[in-house]
Every structure is written in C-alpha cells, then in structure tokens.
C-alpha cells in the first residue's frame, strides 16, 4: 500500500482494494488481516472477497474420491430427480447469510466498503431439463445477492460468457439473456433487499 502511495499524484489518496487471502471470507476474518495493514491515507481502503460456496454445487465439474458434485441447492430444492446430488443442508441460505454477516461485522461496520468481487454457480443441466436444478441456480443467485446487499456488500456476478455448462448470464455476441434463472434470481434479490444496509 505504501509503495502505491509513494508514487505520488492521485495515488497518494487513491482508493485501494485489499483482497482477503485466497479471496476467502473465513481466511480474511480469521487472520484479522486489516489490523495488520497501515495506510497513510485515511479511509481510502476497501476490501474484496469472492464467494463460490459450496464448491460442490457452484463449480465442481466431476465427482471426486472425496465427494460428488451437487445439482440441487437450497431449502426448497431437496427433491431433485438425481439421487445423491443434493447439497449438504449446512450450506443452504442460512450459511450464505452467516458468511455475508461476517463481512458486515468485520469490515462494513468498521468503515470498509465491501465487494463480493465474484460469485456464481454453474447451470449444469440444460434449462428446462430439471426444474429443481433450475430453481436451485435461481435461488442461489437470489440468496447471495440478497444477503450481500443486506449486509452492506456489493455483489458482482461472475459471467463467463461461455458455452454450457457455465455461469453465463448474458450472450454478449447476440446481446441476449442466456440464463433467465440467474438473471431473475438477481433481479428478485435487488427488489427484496434492504437498501441501504445499516
């Protein structure tokens, strides 16, 4: 930080983003990272983490010796057609809320703006093939955005602009919506969130 400040000009007071270790919420909080940082500019730091929990639902591409990838996530999506593909209940909406609350307590409430610089979950099955998977993807996006906003965090969906399966919300080439599940989850969250966070 001081190396940037020392270059002068606008860098002396530029807002700098500090990423947590591995952009991980628990590592950021556990290490009390911001207490170790010194900045000559007052109130010119913000923090960033990414959120892809639980990995088995959001981004795991194939089964591993230690576990299977999950197709279904959330309190309302436990009755999927494929056995053994439902996320562990400990990672449902309550977990998302608890993680975002950690960012509020440890950073937002202490005056640091908070970015959830990336989040997302892969749509694994073709839209319309499995209604419970579709609902899981939508509910995940809604839960992350709702909890982030309500806890003072600015969430940014990671849009890969890729081929299925992916985290693609928009097709940039055709300027069209690729995944209504994701977009509608975000839109519903923005409407229901408590603005501004307190």
Residue ranges and their predicted role:
Residues 126-198:
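Aromatic-rich peripheral "rim/lid" segments of glycoside hydrolase catalytic domains that contact
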Residues 99-106, 140-144:
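A general structural detector for well-ordered alpha-helical segments in enzyme core domains, enriched
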Residues 1-90, 101-121, 150-151:
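Active-site region of glycoside hydrolase catalytic domains
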Residues 24-25, 92-93, 122, 164, ...:
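Alpha-helix initiation/capping motif
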Residues 83-93, 128-134:
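The substrate-binding groove and active-site-proximal loops of carbohydrate-active enzymes
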């Amino acid at each position: 930080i001081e190396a940037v400040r020392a270059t002068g000009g606008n860098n002396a007071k530029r807002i700098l983003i500090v990423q947590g270790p591995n952009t991980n919420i628990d590592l950021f909080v556990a290490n009390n990272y911001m207490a170790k940082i010194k900045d000559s500019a007052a109130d010119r730091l913000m923090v960033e983490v990414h959120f892809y929990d639980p990995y088995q639902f959001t981004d795991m591409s194939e089964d591993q010796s230690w576990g299977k990838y999950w197709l279904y996530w959330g309190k309302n999506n436990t009755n999927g057609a494929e056995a053994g593909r439902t996320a562990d209940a400990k990672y449902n909406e309550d977990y998302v809320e608890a993680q975002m609350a950690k960012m509020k307590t440890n950073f937002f409430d202490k005056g640091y703006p908070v970015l959830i610089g990336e989040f997302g979950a892969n749509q694994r099955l073709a839209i319309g093939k499995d209604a419970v998977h579709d609902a899981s993807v939508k509910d995940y996006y809604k839960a992350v955005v709702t909890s982030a906003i309500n806890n003072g965090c600015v969430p940014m969906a990671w849009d890969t602009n890729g081929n299925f399966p992916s985290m693609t919300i928009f097709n940039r080439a055709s300027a069209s919506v690729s995944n209504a599940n994701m977009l509608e989850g975000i839109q519903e969250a923005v409407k229901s969130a408590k603005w501004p966070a307190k």
